[in-house]
């Protein structure tokens, strides 16, 4: 018989919650059409290992998160594994997928602009992502697309940020019980 005992506990830890739809880089060099229906949107939380009940080195293992319901009872929200974490460092956990947020994604255009040798290919493709929110409140969804090669966003329905050399991100506000559409066209060169 195995019994699990909590090593430590912290309450009222301020967290930053993020809804994340993450793409893949394979579909920027070919023609695909539909890329996914009812795709899952990940739920992440981030907190700093400092302050009340924290601020000590955290050992590698499982962290479970609970949230109080309307009656004040702790309800299990999710869990994730962490590596050894020093004090004053941030911790990011994936709690699972949102069951009331989905996305439909499709490629709306594709063309090869150049390329006859192994490394001189230029492709241009367009995408549409429809985010659907069944929650009673509006949410902000981060759409993160890993872009291969040397890439340029040619046009977009909302401004992106270049999160890293190979990553574009959009912050899409999705209304309560509604939907929002992100469209963009990208040129990639290998």
Which functions belong to the PLM regions below?
Residues 1-190:
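Long, intrinsically disordered, low-complexity accessory segments associated with secretion
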């Amino acid at each position: 018989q195995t019994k699990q005992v909590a090593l430590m506990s912290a309450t009222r830890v301020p967290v930053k919650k993020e809804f994340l739809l993450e793409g893949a880089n394979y579909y920027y060099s070919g023609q695909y059409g539909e890329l996914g229906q009812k795709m899952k949107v990940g739920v992440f939380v981030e907190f700093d290992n400092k302050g009340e009940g924290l601020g000590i080195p955290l050992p590698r293992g499982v962290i479970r998160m609970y949230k109080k319901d309307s009656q004040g009872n702790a309800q299990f929200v999710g869990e994730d594994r962490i590596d050894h974490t020093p004090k004053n460092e941030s911790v990011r956990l994936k709690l699972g997928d949102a069951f009331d947020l989905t996305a439909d994604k499709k490629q709306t255009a594709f063309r090869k602009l150049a390329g006859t040798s192994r490394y001189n290919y230029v492709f241009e493709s367009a995408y549409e992502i429809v985010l659907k929110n069944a929650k009673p409140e509006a949410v902000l969804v981060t759409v993160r697309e890993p872009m291969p090669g040397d890439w340029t966003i040619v046009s977009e329905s909302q401004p992106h940020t270049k999160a890293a050399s190979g990553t574009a991100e959009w912050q899409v506000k999705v209304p309560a019980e509604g939907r929002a559409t992100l469209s963009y066209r990208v040129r990639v060169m290998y």
